[in-house]
Amino acid sequence: MFLAAQTMISPPEAVRKELDSGCAGWQLAPVTPEIAAEIKTRTPGWPPNLLPGDFNGDGQTDVAVLIECRGSAQLVAFLSNGSGFSRQVLEKPQAYDPREFLHLIRKEYEHDAIGVEYEAVGGHAWVFRDGRWQSVVR
């Protein structure tokens, strides 16, 4: 499902096509060199701001991405149904900040959760509960 490009993982094709249709020229939101180095030690081969997990607990691999498009950042989750993905915008376009990054949260919630962190500031989590996404302050 995930594609390796020169040892770097990229989003599944269906996710890339969906992102292309919403914002031609999008890219995974770049991060500071310090954050990139930290992410590389935790998850070699995975780029910053591409996050796989089972966010709704159905056993399928879902995907969250923090993208940069036309100078704005947007957080989008893609829930897998086994044959495709449903797109859900979690955070509408806002000013892009290279100190913002995603990380996977396990064991704190019923299912995997999306952590949205700001370097040296803190952050929040997006948790899928009762059929909908909820933002939780951490």
State the predicted function of each range.
Residues M1-G25, S86-R138:
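Acidic, small-residue rich beta-repeat scaffolds with periodic aromatic anchors
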Residues D20-T41:
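Transition segment at domain starts
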Residues P44-G45:
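Extracellular/luminal recognition modules and glycoprotein regions
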Residues P48-L50:
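Primarily EF-hand calcium-binding motifs
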Residues D54-N56, Q60, C69:
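Calcium-coordinating acidic loop motifs
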Residues G71-A77, G122-W126:
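Structural motif
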Residues S80-G84:
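Short edge-strand/loop segments of extracellular domains
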